[in-house]
Amino acid sequence: MKIKRKTLLVSIFIFVLVCNPIVANAINTGFLTNELPEEEQISFVQNIDLCLIESEPSKNAVVCFDVNENQMIAVGKKSSDRKTICIYSSDGTFQYGYTFNCSGDFGVEWDKDNLNIYFVRSDVVISVSPDGEILDVLEVTNSIENNSYVNHFFHATERTIGDTTYIIRNDMGIFNWVATSCSQIVIKDVSGAENVVYDVNSAQLLSAILSAIFILTFAIIVVTVIFRPVIKSMRTNKNKYDFCK
């Protein structure tokens, strides 16, 4: 059933492109964009193979997030195979999500109830409806303005909606320095009270400890390899000096 639904949505997108080659952009984004040729749009949609998911997958570390005016939280999750984006309500209840192919980093950006997904390596942004329909595909131009937008929006760890602030963070003490993603989503109200609505801190802490052990072990090996010949040479020279005495 899901395969038929996915095939139908892709077919609708291709049909709209063929029948309406010139249409107004459906995407409202902070990026400066250009139209992509129809063939490239169709190829991109087929390659990413985006699917709607209706049950919550396992929770992983957060690599990107955004919050819309209805306080729906889009969470991009860390994964090694297909990428996952899950949509949660403000109390942390799963609503729906998407999985898709992506060989690099990605970011999320709300456009009212639709979600924009930015594919960093491809320099492409797509608009996806809540039911998984791809509404538009645009090229993100290589510009100073877009680079600035990525740094200030997609790399930001806070979003403020009204009097409520949404924060992604780690709570692993000294091991925060090795984390490449975040383990918690916290909601802070106007009084400063915090409520954790998404938490994978325990799993992330174990990963951070293993990473720290690996980094320290590697550093020790490198230092040993570099300085061992120097120390050996110093000892040899000292022995020669003692012999001459």
Task: Indicate residue ranges for each PLM-predicted region.
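Positively charged n-region of N-terminal signal peptides that target proteins for export
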Residues: 1-7
